[in-house]
Amino acid sequence: MLPSKRVPFLFTIILFLAGLGQHTTESVLPDCVLYPRCLITKDPCCM
C-alpha cells in the first residue's frame, strides 16, 4: 500500500495528465489544463 500522503499527490498527477490529454484533443481553455488549480477553485470547465 502507498503511504496515505502520496495518494493525493499521485491522484493530482493523474488528473493533470488527463487535463493535458483533454487539452490536446478538445482544445479546451488553458486554465482547464491546470488541474491542481481547478480542484482548488472548483472550475466548472474542468468537470
From Swiss-Prot:
The keyword S-adenosyl-L-methionine does not apply. Its main location: secreted. It comes from the Eukaryota. GO terms for molecular function: hormone activity. Responsible for physiological and behavioral changes in mated female flies. This is Accessory gland peptide Acp33A. Keywords: Behavior, Secreted, Signal. GO terms for biological process: negative regulation of female receptivity, post-mating; sexual reproduction. Residues 1-21 form the signal peptide. It is found in: Secreted. Main cells of accessory gland and seminal fluid. One of its GO terms (cellular component) is extracellular space.
